[in-house]
A protein has these predicted regions:
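Alpha-helical substrate-recognition element adjacent to the catalytic core
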Residues: 199-212
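The alpha/beta-hydrolase serine catalytic core
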Residues: 76-196
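Local beta-strand N-terminus motif with an aromatic residue
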Residues: 1, 56, 138, 197-198
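Active-site catalytic motif of lipid deacylating hydrolases and related acyltransferases
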Residues: 1-53
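Residue in the alpha/beta-hydrolase core beta-strand immediately N-terminal to the catalytic nucleophile
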Residues: 57-60, 76-78
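Glycosyltransferases and closely related glycan-assembly transferases
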Residues: 70-76
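Gly/Ala-rich beta-loop-alpha elbow adjacent to hydrolase catalytic centers
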Residues: 60-70
Length: 212
């Protein structure tokens, strides 16, 4: 089986239900995930080391994790509702916040200060640097059309062609994972295995006939 590295979102942890859901959807894959340090400089350093050590076949990041995943060059990657504007996303969350999932370090709450928001705002300036044509073919973005938190489809699409809207909100629920994420994983898997499945593109006009 293949190895997938999962990069969690803000106020989450490696104990996120998303990890369990992905494992159930892909029983033959090995899933690796770790708690990300709160400060972005420490976060990216840890994730880069982890990617080098684990050598995953695929990296999947959601929300804040999608922002980090864009920076992990040299791997096939899927970003789900990536929070490239973390400073803006966090600015409505100042004060004490609780982690939604247990962390290994036992910390269960976080103070979101102006300083921390500035750290993220400065850090996200690094996104979209030095993108090669090869990288453009290795990064897929999935974007919920009803996401109340993050609106980064256009920003992503300026840099990467493989931007895919889906019907859903911010969280990666199993229905979205099954209908949108799994097919993309399958495309990547086929590409890695040197297989091409026949893909039929059906134009809306082809369906829009006297029956509709």
């Amino acid at each position: 089986g293949k190895k997938i590295m999962y990069v969690h979102g803000f106020l989450s942890s490696a104990q996120s239900g998303t990890v369990k859901m992905l494992q159930e959807l892909m029983p033959n894959a090995t899933l690796v995930a770790e708690d990300i340090p709160v400060h972005p400089e420490e976060g990216i350093e840890m994730l880069q080391k982890m990617a080098e050590t684990e050598k995953p076949d695929l990296i999947i990041g959601t929300s804040m994790g999608g922002m980090y995943t864009e920076l992990l060059k040299g791997f096939d990657r899927i970003l789900v509702n990536p929070a490239f504007k973390m400073g803006d996303t966090m600015s409505s969350m100042t004060g004490k916040q609780e982690f939604q999932n247990p962390r290994k370090d036992g910390v269960n709450e976080l103070m979101v200060t102006k300083g921390l928001i500035k750290e993220y705002r400065d850090f996200t300036e690094r996104c979209f640097q030095d993108i090669t044509p090869e990288e453009q073919q290795r990064v897929y973005g999935l974007f919920g059309d009803a996401d109340p938190l993050v609106h980064t489809f256009d920003l992503f699409h300026e840099h990467y062609p493989l931007a895919i809207p889906f019907h859903g909100e911010h969280r990666l629920i199993d229905k979205v994972a099954f209908h949108y994420l799994c097919p993309v994983i399958r495309w990547i898997d086929d590409k890695q295995n040197g297989k091409e499945r026949p893909i039929v593109y059906i134009d809306f006009d082809a369906l829009h006939d006297s029956y509709m």
